[in-house]
């Protein structure tokens, strides 16, 4: 029987998962077992082309096996598509840093990170940075973080402010653009610019995720065939209403998941 074990096609005479596990690890107990994206301790009958992953806890695998292990919990056949995608994340604050990390964990092959700012203490309440990153450019800090999570992702950085003059050259090679700015003017400039210069290019933007209002008011809406908007559309940051990690993270999750759906050619919200 032909199966896929840790990303490699093999022939086996084993009929069940337990038989296969014993063949490779005898009676070791520190083995994580994943079948077609699902972790299980149960015995399972093997069948042709089933995908099985064994991970020995505490042991660093070879580079060839490591990439497969990173995506072992993915839904089957997702990784082949996402690793070919190139996504731009414009703005690396509370939304953008969380979105970029999510996409890196998902296995997106190329991430294009754009921001001109540096990490400062007030960023740490909602952004994916650490004390050790203070004073670093956000592009550099986030690239370093991603390298520790998914070393197979190519990370391209541009330490610039997006303007009408550079927008077309910045985003011409990206499959999908993610708007993650924190000011209305920047949001409008990017969304309108992508729609104008790149007909057919998908853009996922945000509006309304400040404060600590209900999580359930944050939605993903399809505005046009190529423009998606995440948030509640109302709760912008202002005096007396700040940006908090939980709701910012929820909105970032909406954006990252919509980007994943678009990569997988799922166009409905």
Model-predicted segments: where are they?
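N-terminal charged helix/coil linker that caps or initiates catalytic domains
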Residues: 42, 53-87
């Amino acid at each position: 029987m032909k199966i896929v074990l840790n990303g490699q096609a093999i022939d086996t005479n084993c009929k069940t998962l337990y038989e296969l596990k014993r063949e490779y690890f005898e009676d070791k107990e520190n083995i994580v077992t994943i079948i077609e994206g699902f972790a299980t301790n149960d015995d399972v009958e093997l069948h042709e082309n089933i995908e099985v992953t064994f991970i020995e806890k505490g042991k660093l695998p070879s580079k060839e096996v490591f990439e497969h292990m990173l995506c072992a919990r993915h839904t089957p056949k997702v990784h082949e598509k996402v690793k070919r995608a190139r996504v731009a994340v414009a703005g690396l604050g509370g939304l953008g840093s969380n979105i970029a990390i999510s996409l890196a964990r998902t296995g997106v092959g190329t991430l294009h990170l754009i921001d001109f700012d540096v990490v400062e203490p007030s960023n740490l309440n909602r952004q994916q940075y650490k004390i050790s990153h203070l004073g670093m450019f956000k592009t550099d800090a986030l690239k370093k973080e991603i390298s520790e999570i998914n070393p197979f992702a190519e990370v391209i950085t541009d330490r610039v402010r997006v303007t009408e003059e550079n927008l077309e050259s910045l985003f011409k090679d990206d499959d999908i653009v993610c708007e993650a700015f924190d000011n209305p003017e920047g949001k409008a400039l990017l969304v309108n610019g992508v729609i104008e210069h790149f007909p057919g290019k998908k853009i996922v933007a945000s509006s309304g995720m400040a404060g600590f209002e209900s999580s359930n008011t944050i939605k993903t809406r399809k505005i046009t065939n190529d423009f998606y908007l995440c948030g509640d559309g109302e709760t912008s940051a202002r005096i007396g209403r700040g940006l908090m990690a939980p709701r910012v993270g929820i909105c970032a999750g909406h954006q990252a998941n919509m980007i994943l759906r678009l990569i997988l050619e799922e166009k409905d919200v």
